[in-house]
Amino acid sequence: MQLNIPTWLTLFRVVLIPFFVLAFYLPFVWAPMVCAIIFVFAAATDWFDGFLARRWKQTTRFGAFLDPVADKVMVAVALVLVAEHYHSWWITLPAATMIAREIIISSLREWMAEIGKRSSVAVSWVGKVKTMAQMGSLVGLLWRPDHNVELASFVLLYIAAVLTFWSMFQYLNAAWSDLLEP
């Protein structure tokens, strides 16, 4: 297998995860900003690798597998770190909801692909808006430069949580008849 630039970008995103975690725990005033910058950079590679793969016609099976895995791991790690930092149910609850949704939908997509109906659970616009709200909230909650950014990030986190439920129910609804078949 020959790796192309989009796949290298996806692999780079995976490699950034331990550095992102390390930056989170560094005992320096600038550590939250560095952590947020690494997260933003990783999130940007998520968009860029897909863009390049489509534009250069370099989509691969490995890239199609690795890209969503890298995304989910990056976001799940960020949500766990944020929940740990705030150590509060009102942050942990939406974080756990979002992680659970990712596991449920990933499993649903895999199952639908096995029965030949992968397109029934394609990514929706609600999922894309959820991702934008989620990324925005995580950047703010990782960085925490001031109280206003933190408050705006809390609001975005809850918007992302609501959209998480909405998109999850859309996916489940699209697959419902297949799920109920004997």
Curated annotation (Swiss-Prot):
Keyword Lipid biosynthesis: yes
Cytoplasmic side: 1-12, 82-86, 169-181
Main EC class the enzyme belongs to: transferase
Localization terms from the record: Cell inner membrane
EC annotation from Swiss-Prot or TrEMBL: 2.7.8.5
Record's keyword terms, sorted: Cell inner membrane, Cell membrane, Lipid biosynthesis, Lipid metabolism, Membrane, Phospholipid biosynthesis, Phospholipid metabolism, Transferase, Transmembrane, Transmembrane helix
Pfam families membership: CDP-OH_P_transf
GO molecular function (one): CDP-diacylglycerol-glycerol-3-phosphate 3-phosphatidyltransferase activity
Broad class of the protein's primary localization: membrane
Family according to the record: Belongs to the CDP-alcohol phosphatidyltransferase class-I family.
Catalytic activity: a CDP-1,2-diacyl-sn-glycerol + sn-glycerol 3-phosphate = a 1,2-diacyl-sn-glycero-3-phospho-(1'-sn-glycero-3'-phosphate) + CMP + H(+)
Top-level taxon of the source organism: Bacteria
Family matches, as HAMAP family: PgsA
Lineage of origin: Bacteria, Pseudomonadati, Pseudomonadota, Gammaproteobacteria, Enterobacterales
Function: Catalyzes the conversion of cytidine diphosphate diacylglycerol (CDP-DG) and glycerol 3-phosphate into phosphatidylglycerol. Essential for the synthesis of anionic phospholipids, thereby playing a role in balancing the ratio of zwitterionic and anionic phospholipids, which is thought to be important for normal membrane function.
Pathway of action: Phospholipid metabolism; phosphatidylglycerol biosynthesis; phosphatidylglycerol from CDP-diacylglycerol: step 1/2
PANTHER family: CDP-DIACYLGLYCEROL--GLYCEROL-3-PHOSPHATE 3-PHOSPHATIDYLTRANSFERASE 1, CHLOROPLASTIC (PTHR14269:SF62), CDP-DIACYLGLYCEROL--GLYCEROL-3-PHOSPHATE 3-PHOSPHATIDYLTRANSFERASE-RELATED (PTHR14269)
Bilayer disposition of the protein: Multi-pass membrane protein
Residue spans, topological domain Periplasmic: 38-60, 108-145
Name of the protein: CDP-diacylglycerol--glycerol-3-phosphate 3-phosphatidyltransferase
Matching Gene3D superfamilies: 1.20.120.1760
